[in-house]
Amino acid sequence: GIALVSTVMNFQTIRFADNNDLPLVLILPSYTATAWYHKKLPPAMQSKSIAQVVDEGRKFAANEYAPAMLRIDSLSPAERNTLAERYSSLTGLSKDFVERNNFRVDLGEFNKELLRSERRTTGRLDSRFKGIDRDAAGDGPDSDPSMNAIRPPYTAAFNSYVRGDLGFKSDVEYYILGGGITTPWNWNTNNAYADTSIPLKDAMAKNPYMKIFLAQGYYDMATPFYAAEYTVSAMNLDPSLRRNITFDYYEAGHMMYIDTKSLAKLKRDATAFIQNAVARAER
């Protein structure tokens, strides 16, 4: 089987661009989760659980927002007003801000705007984190506060482990993220978005016993959970193969294992996935 943690397979689902509205729809439930966490939703929504809240976001994204974006410039004034009110109530953003952005609020704009009145920003890897920018008037955050908080201790811990515990030394630069890691990647795509769901579908068809486990954080804005759900639902799998896919969700971000409760849940979920896969294989 395969375990996918905080995954993106189809990069069209997360690349904000002038000619690509899909990420706007697929990240909306994550906006809802983030607004709920920071207590920016109406009282009726704040009283719901995180699972209930994101389900409201899913329904709006699929049944109202996505159809509206197909004809956004031809909506009547009344339709635009209704859409703006619903969008605002599910994201914590003002109706005026949503309308001024023509309903296209990308991640940077959301991270800057949600807590602007508090002169704070929200994180990309984990939207529970708050950041402080040089000024509160920009269009996007200066940096990712969750990355700023997570990266230094992980770097220090790994350096201590490799040099201290293992006694390994090298003058070769070690990349924590990006740089020398991502630059040479070959996605085997030309003039198209990278999409690994296609080879995954082929692999599942060739091996119908293969199981897939997807672990997604509600507050992960880098690889939103609804984008992963959409990708899986669009793989055009045979019905007999769909039952081989398991989703589990965590009240954390991209690196859900930094949260103690989510780490324990991830271990339980992964253990159950492996045990279930082995049990089926032995039948």
Where are these regions (language model features)?
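Active-site-adjacent alpha-helix of alpha/beta-hydrolase-fold enzymes
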Residues: L26-P29, M221-N244
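Catalytic histidine-centered segment of alpha/beta-hydrolase-like enzymes
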Residues: E251-L263
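A short acidic (Asp/Glu
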Residues: I14-F16, T223-A227, I258-T260
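Alpha/beta-hydrolase fold catalytic core
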Residues: M69-A222
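Short, solvent-exposed loop/turn segments at secondary-structure junctions
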Residues: M9-N10, Y219-M221, G253-M255
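A catalytic-pocket lid/entrance helix-loop region that shapes and gates access to the active site
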Residues: G1-G92
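C-terminal alpha-helix
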Residues: D269-R280
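Short glycine-rich catalytic loops that host catalytic nucleophiles or stabilize transition states
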Residues: L4, F247-G253
